[in-house]
Amino acid sequence: MKQASPRAGGAKARRGQVARKTKETDVSVELRLEPGESSIATGLPFFDHMLDQIARHGGLTLSVQAKGDLQVDAHHTVEDVGIGLGEALRQATADKAGLARYGVAVVPLDEALVEAVVDLSGRPHLTFNAKLPSGKRFIGAYDVDLTQDFLQAFVNHARICLHVNVRYGRNLHHVVEAIFKATARALRAATAREGTALPSTKGLL
């Protein structure tokens, strides 16, 4: 007998959809809190790969289409995708009744090990403890310093609390990928359903 997913929310799937257009970027994001086929195109292949990690390991169906002023810098594109993804997640988790609320994940990638902890608190906060390997800053056209900027934009607009701790790692690619995977796994746990009650003694999140 097929068992229902712990994230199933009845007939209506939990989803969010955002379109954001500025003089610097044109971003659209659609997110569903259920596994499915994802479509991601930002003009930054490594960043696309990282967003795919969020979808796959977060148990999401994710569509991200972004066009930005990459001839200037990747910052606007990466940050605005973070804004869109955060807003879409906030929509998808607007009804927090029955959600686990908290999620913890520790993810290895060969020699790298990263911990992520999520609280769907309604209060945006990011702690990013990541001493990245020295000697290299770019993976393809992706500036690894933008990882924190992406997560900050995501957290601010999702209105969640996220702690990321890079315990260790030598290979820059492995460390950054483990950051995205750990964040995704923690989100997956936090958005799982555990019943019907709101996970707060205040009665509000």
From Swiss-Prot:
GO terms for biological process: L-histidine biosynthetic process. The keyword Chaperone does not apply. The keyword Amino-acid biosynthesis applies. Residues 1-27 are annotated as: Disordered. Gene3D superfamilies: Imidazole glycerol phosphate dehydratase, domain 1. Pathway: Amino-acid biosynthesis; L-histidine biosynthesis; L-histidine from 5-phospho-alpha-D-ribose 1-diphosphate: step 6/9. It comes from the Bacteria. Keywords: Amino-acid biosynthesis, Cytoplasm, Histidine biosynthesis, Lyase. It catalyses: D-erythro-1-(imidazol-4-yl)glycerol 3-phosphate = 3-(imidazol-4-yl)-2-oxopropyl phosphate + H2O. Its main location: cytoplasm. It is found in: Cytoplasm. SUPFAM superfamilies: Ribosomal protein S5 domain 2-like. GO terms for cellular component: cytoplasm. It holds the Pfam family IGPD. GO terms for molecular function: imidazoleglycerol-phosphate dehydratase activity. Its EC number is 4.2.1.19. Belongs to the imidazoleglycerol-phosphate dehydratase family. This is Imidazoleglycerol-phosphate dehydratase. It comes from Anaeromyxobacter sp. (strain Fw109-5).
